Design a protein with these regions (language model features):
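Active-/binding-site microenvironments in catalytic and ligand-binding cores
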Residues: 1-228
């Protein structure tokens, strides 16, 4: 069974607070005067389900177009159940029980349960999201050289919440995961649709195909999983 694990891009959808979302403008429609339908899409690259490459927070880091195909096609994938609530971080201690799994996979998907707020409570999902704390970013980048990326069912690697303590602000979280300090990085796929993946399911293959637009730091990705 194949499943989409990315959300549709929606002009009424989500981005980081204050950042723009996708806009669509219809140019033509099928009529007596025109044989075809067409649209123009204006697409900020950090709205909807998208992949943060190092260049997002590292001046000389790799961009989405610099990453090898291995970052987008995965046959060793795990779904990690790590329940978290609004403005709660994922720490090294949360990941340590999964060390054996993380050592064997190229991509890990973290399901916290925060996705439940996406359709019911925009303020909570957008402004009080969970986050990947610096200790977790360091743990991932320092210990699992085969790990290419981590996907998450919350808005972003960092949280916009004012409850985040000093040292766990959004730039801190991104920098520790994307290689700002050491050059070692794990990419992040933010704002994923993981709610419908059956608990305990084996993910045989996972694809996160990017829009290869020249010059971008990061990109939307269409995420598709084959579930056994």
């Amino acid at each position: 069974m194949f499943m989409f694990l990315s959300h549709p891009l929606d002009p009424e959808g989500y981005a980081w607070p204050g950042e723009p979302v996708v806009k669509t403008t219809q140019c033509t429609d099928v009529s007596d005067d025109c044989p075809f339908c067409s649209f123009v899409s204006e697409l900020p690259n950090h709205c909807g389900t998208h992949m943060d490459a190092p260049r997002h927070f590292v001046k000389d880091g790799l961009s989405i177009n610099d990453l090898s195909i291995d970052y987008f096609c995965n046959t060793e994938v795990a779904l990690l159940e790590i329940p978290k609530g609004p403005a709660e971080g994922i720490y090294k201690e949360d990941l340590e029980p999964f060390a054996d799994i993380l050592s064997k996979v190229s991509f890990a998907l973290i399901r916290t349960g925060m996705e439940k707020y996406r359709e019911t409570d925009q303020n909570t999902y957008q402004n009080e999201g969970s986050y990947i704390a610096p200790s977790a970013g360091d743990y991932l980048t320092e210990n699992f050289p085969n790990l290419k990326g981590v996907g998450m069912d919350f808005l972003a690697i960092g949280s916009a919440s004012s409850k985040c303590p000093e040292g766990e602000l959004p730039p801190d979280c991104h920098r520790h995961m994307l290689g700002y300090y050491t050059g070692k990085f794990v990419t992040g796929v933010e704002d994923m649709h993981l709610a419908d993946v059956p608990k305990g399911a084996k993910i045989k293959r996972f694809f996160n195909a990017p829009l290869l637009i020249k010059g971008l730091d990061s990109s939307q990705v269409v995420c598709i999983a084959e579930i056994e």
